[in-house]
């Protein structure tokens, strides 16, 4: 059994931040459970581009508001508490944040926790262990 709190993660190597977002990596690849689980906060009035070419991501919006844009179709979806989106086709997408968003995210395969988005918004391919 693994029990962690976001308070215990804050300020550690599991607390990863960039210009417009912060992600607390609660469950990671080294936990050996086949997925990773994160609490991610995106700053208000920001725009972030993502493209997870090597991962499937499920996102549950807990608080805030924004817009999700699918770059392939141009379709836009409101992001409000209670909204889930699943990037099961490795979609290139944009998150436009109106009010600070707090989201719970699951990645498969799991991330290690120190990945950095490249210029396209993607994480590198996972390395087999």
Swiss-Prot record:
One Pfam family from the record: Ectoine_synth
Molecular function via GO: ectoine synthase activity
Catalytic EC class: lyase
SUPFAM superfamilies listed in its UniProt record: RmlC-like cupins
Entry keyword DNA-binding: no
Domain of life: Bacteria
Keywords, ordered alphabetically: Lyase
E.C. designation(s): 4.2.1.108
Pathway the protein contributes to: Amine and polyamine biosynthesis; ectoine biosynthesis; L-ectoine from L-aspartate 4-semialdehyde: step 3/3
InterPro entries documented for this protein: Ectoine_synth, RmlC-like_jellyroll, RmlC_Cupin_sf
Catalytic activity line of the entry: (2S)-4-acetamido-2-aminobutanoate = L-ectoine + H2O
GO biological process: ectoine biosynthetic process
UniProt keyword Nucleotide-binding, yes or no: no
Function per UniProt: Catalyzes the circularization of gamma-N-acetyl-alpha,gamma-diaminobutyric acid (ADABA) to ectoine (1,4,5,6-tetrahydro-2-methyl-4-pyrimidine carboxylic acid), which is an excellent osmoprotectant.
HAMAP family given in the database record: Ectoine_synth (MF_01255)
Family the UniProt entry places it in: Belongs to the ectoine synthase family.
Record-given protein name: L-ectoine synthase
Organism: Mycobacterium sp. (strain KMS)
């Amino acid at each position: 059994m693994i029990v962690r709190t976001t308070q215990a993660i804050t300020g550690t190597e599991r607390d990863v931040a960039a210009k417009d977002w912060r992600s607390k990596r609660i469950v990671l690849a080294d936990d050996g459970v086949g997925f990773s689980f994160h609490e991610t906060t995106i700053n208000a009035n920001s725009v972030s581009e993502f493209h997870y070419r090597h991962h499937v991501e499920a996102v549950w919006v807990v608080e805030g508001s924004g817009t999700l844009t699918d770059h392939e179709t141009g379709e836009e979806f409101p992001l409000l508490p209670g909204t889930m989106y699943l990037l099961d086709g490795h979609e290139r997408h944009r998150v436009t944040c109106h009010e600070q968003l707090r989201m719970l995210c699951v990645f498969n395969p799991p991330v290690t926790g120190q990945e950095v988005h490249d210029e396209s918004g993607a994480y590198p391919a996972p390395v087999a262990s």
